[in-house]
Amino acid sequence: TAAGLTCFQVPGVPAPVQDTAPRTGERQQQEQVALAARDAMAGQLMGKLMQTLGSAGPAAAIGVCREAAPQIAAETGKKFGVAIGRTSFRLRNPKNAPPSWADPLVAAQPADPQFVPLPDGQLGALLPIRLKPECMLCHGPKDQILTEVREALATHYPPDQATGFQTGDLRGWFWVTVPAGARSPGTNAPTSANEKL
């Protein structure tokens, strides 16, 4: 469910905003799985975006999010045993609408990670995405976006709402739905929420 050019910065992962549910060992493990899945998807997607930006330019990079991002999300979900995607309060691609559990959080636009207990022992995670300078190529003010990029956006995303941002702005979130009993692949070592992208 990821198909709008979104660049990623996971800034030192601020302390999660706590809900009122007790944080059991199971809950902590689910949070670690969510963060590890986010790191994996963000790292792969950002790597592909930067490679395409360097070799083919920003207009071509739009295709990465349209075509490669859903595949990366599916592969990441399978690897970690979760459902994962990206969403925003200003969508580029309507297919990136949030799952229903995340609707109220997206409306509130939280700037910090959110963890939400869900039915059947599942955990929902909403993890912020902030824009880096290179993201302005496709997400900056319209009058500063190259003509070829504006044309590509108009072709692929006529209802685009994802321009007019500044560096450092909250662009949206990774959402992750973690089932009960989930474990990170290769949990011999603790998962890192601070993996550099």
Question: Predicted regions span which residues?
Answer:
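Bacterial N-terminal signal peptides
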Residues: T1-G4
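Short, cysteine/histidine-rich loop/knuckle motifs that typically chelate Zn2+
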Residues: L137
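Extracytoplasmic c-type cytochrome modules immediately beyond a signal peptide or single-pass transmembrane anchor
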Residues: C7-E134, D143-L197
